[in-house]
């Protein structure tokens, strides 16, 4: 029998996060599923859940992996059963669903968003997959609208720029771009060239080299039409705009982009996305991150999760390099600070929930 109270990291009235031992375990109804958390990962978005983004008492955290404990009466479409090892990304610090977040002993998710962890991956590796592959799928195949996907690859390869190729979203994007039949052109520091190439990049460039954008345009014969910016700063946007070919194209960021940079090239169409949009529900965070409910986004979320299941089952995608730490939720608090202070580079930070 599932306990009624649990430990979780929750928002405070002061706009921070603390460890609580008296939080309610989510009720399971409809097509939702209860999961006992075995591992969680910390993402840059977790560092942004402060101040006005905090709902007092709401559970924090996005990426998790664990074991199915309970299945709702309407959760019958995705072959999810008690005892299954699963992972995904959910929306933590959600004012509309405050009892659900990854940083808790038990969490809940609708059945269709869950990925079964294949036998060759650990809970810790599973916990690193959600945000990286969900967000990049949304960016590449919805926002940028690449004319091909991992199930039906493009027949004519074309170069796709992935800025920040050594980040967790970057290595996920490189894999997906290649599986979709395109040529991933990535940027990163020289020390990470081999890492990014090992994930499938066709060519890798040093973003700090002053000739980098001209070298990319020369290498790609000025044909880049699509750019995914996994770093999403003003300088990274400027870089992508300079690397996109003469005919223009599309640019997608993971944070709000600079309108000033956008005005420098009218032939480039900019956009920015957030992973939780794939749930199709209202995102009631402050502007500019508020979003209305969007059924079309929800439909894409169902589609893309099904694609990821197939890719995982076939062993076609692999997680970013991870650093595994013990200590459970108390240590996750320190992990959030490690990410905020940029003490972790080139690896995804994962915490075991049970020692």
Swiss-Prot record:
Disruption phenotype: Completely abolishes trichosetin production. Keywords: NADP, Nucleotide-binding, Oxidoreductase. It catalyses: L-serine + 7 malonyl-CoA + acetyl-CoA + 2 S-adenosyl-L-methionine + ATP + 8 NADPH + 11 H(+) = (5S)-3-[(2E,6R,8E,10E,12E)-2,6-dimethyltetradeca-2,8,10,12-tetraenoyl]-5-(hydroxymethyl)pyrrolidine-2,4-dione + AMP + 2 S-adenosyl-L-homocysteine + 7 CO2 + diphosphate + 8 NADP(+) + 8 CoA + 6 H2O. Transmembrane segments: none annotated. Belongs to the zinc-containing alcohol dehydrogenase family. Pathway: Mycotoxin biosynthesis. Induction: Expression is positively regulated by the trichosetin cluster-specific transcription activator TF22. SUPFAM superfamilies: GroES-like, NAD(P)-binding Rossmann-fold domains. Substrate binds at residues 131-138, 275-279. Hybrid PKS-NRPS synthetase; part of the gene cluster that mediates the biosynthesis of trichosetin, a trans-fused decalin-containing tetramic acid with antimicrobial activity. The PKS module of PKS-NRPS1 together with the enoylreductase (ER) catalyze the formation of the polyketide unit which is then conjugated to L-serine by the condensation domain of the PKS-NRPS1 NRPS module. Activity of the Dieckmann cyclase domain (RED) results in release of the Dieckmann product intermediate. Monomer. Pfam families: ADH_N, ADH_zinc_N. NADP(+) binds at residues 45-48, 166-169, 189-192, 207, 254-255, 344-345. The lineage of its organism: Eukaryota, Fungi, Dikarya, Ascomycota, Pezizomycotina. It is an enzyme of class 1 (oxidoreductase). This is Trans-enoyl reductase. The keyword Magnesium does not apply. Its EC number is 1.-.-.-.
